[in-house]
C-alpha cells in the first residue's frame, strides 16, 4: 500500500510503501485499543493517595466522657471514624494501580491505533523532522499548514534536538522517538506525523 510523503511545508515530495498489516488493518479492534489505553492510564497513576485510619490519627486515647448518665451516645475514642477529626474507614491506601497486559495485546493495540489514524486520513508521513534552529514561532508556522489542533510527532530512533526544543512550548504538540509511540497519545492527538525513519523502524518493531 502506497501513501504520499510530505515535506514540512505540507507539499508532496514522493511516495512510500506502508505495510498493510500495520497501517491498514481491515477491522479495527476498538476493544483492544481501549484495553491498552486503560493499562497505560493505570500505569501512569501515582497511587500515593492515602487517608489515616483510627490507629494513625494523632490524639488522645482517653474516653471522651463517662459511659452512662450524659444522655449522649456512648463513645470510646475521639479518634473513631464517626467523630469529627477522627480516622477514615475504608479510605484510599498507597498502592500500585499497575495491571498486567500481555506484550502481544500491547503490540496489537499499537497496530490498530495506527491503522485507525491512517483510515481517518490523520496519519501523515513526513520526509524529515529536522529544523535548522530551535525556534517555536517557526514550528508553529509549519504546523499551521497541516490545519490541525494537536500533533503527535514520531521520529526515528532519535529526535532532532532543534525540533524537540521548538515543540516544548507549543500547546497540544508532542514529539517522541519511535520507542515512545503509544496507543494513548496516538488516539488522543488529532494528527500523527511520522518521519520516514519512524515508518521503517515501526514496521520492523511491529512485524
Curated annotation (Swiss-Prot):
Q: Return the annotated region ranges for Disordered.
A: 50-75
- Return the protein name: Large ribosomal subunit protein uL4
Pfam family of this protein, just one? Ribosomal_L4
A Gene Ontology annotation in the biological process aspect, one of them, is: translation
Report the GO terms under cellular component: ribonucleoprotein complex; ribosome
UniProt GO molecular function: rRNA binding; structural constituent of ribosome
Per the UniProt record, the source organism is Rickettsia akari (strain Hartford)
Transmembrane spans: none
Q: What does this protein do?
A: One of the primary rRNA binding proteins, this protein initially binds near the 5'-end of the 23S rRNA. It is important during the early stages of 50S assembly. It makes multiple contacts with different domains of the 23S rRNA in the assembled 50S subunit and ribosome. Forms part of the polypeptide exit tunnel.
Top-level division of the source organism's lineage: Bacteria
The protein's matches in SUPFAM superfamilies, at most eight in alphabetical order, are given as:
Ribosomal protein L4
Q: Which InterPro entries does the entry mention?
A: Ribosomal_uL4 (IPR002136), Ribosomal_uL4-like (IPR013005), Ribosomal_uL4_dom_sf (IPR023574)
Gene symbol?
rplD
What UniProt keywords are attached to this protein's entry?
Answer: Ribonucleoprotein, Ribosomal protein, RNA-binding, rRNA-binding
The record's note on quaternary structure and interaction partners says: Part of the 50S ribosomal subunit.
Protein family membership: Belongs to the universal ribosomal protein uL4 family.
Amino acid at each position: 500500500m502506497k501513501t504520499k510523503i510530505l515535506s514540512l511545508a505540507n507539499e508532496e515530495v514522493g511516495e512510500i510503501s506502508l505495510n498493510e498489516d500495520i497501517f491498514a488493518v481491515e477491522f479495527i479492534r476498538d476493544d483492544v485499543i481501549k484495553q491498552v489505553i486503560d493499562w497505560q492510564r493505570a500505569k501512569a497513576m501515582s497511587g500515593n493517595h492515602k487517608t489515616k485510619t483510627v490507629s494513625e490519627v494523632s490524639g488522645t486515647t482517653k474516653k471522651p466522657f463517662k459511659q452512662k448518665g450524659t444522655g449522649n451516645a456512648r463513645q470510646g475514642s475521639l479518634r473513631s471514624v464517626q467523630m469529627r477529626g477522627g480516622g477514615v474507614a475504608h479510605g484510599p491506601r498507597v498502592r500500585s494501580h499497575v495491571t498486567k497486559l500481555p506484550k502481544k495485546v500491547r503490540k496489537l493495540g499499537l497496530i490498530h491505533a495506527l491503522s485507525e489514524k491512517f483510515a481517518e486520513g490523520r496519519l501523515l508521513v513526513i520526509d524529515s523532522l529536522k529544523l535548522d534552529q530551535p525556534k517555536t514561532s517557526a514550528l508553529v508556522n509549519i504546523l499551521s499548514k497541516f490545519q490541525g489542533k494537536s500533533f503527535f510527532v514520531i521520529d526515528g530512533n532519535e529526535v532532532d534536538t532543534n525540533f524537540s526544543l521548538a515543540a516544548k512550548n507549543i500547546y497540544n504538540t508532542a514529539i517522541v522517538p519511535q520507542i515512545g509511540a503509544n496507543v494513548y497519545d496516538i488516539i488522543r492527538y488529532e494528527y500523527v506525523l511520522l518521519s520516514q525513519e519512524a515508518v521503517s523502524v515501526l514496521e520492523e518493531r511491529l512485524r
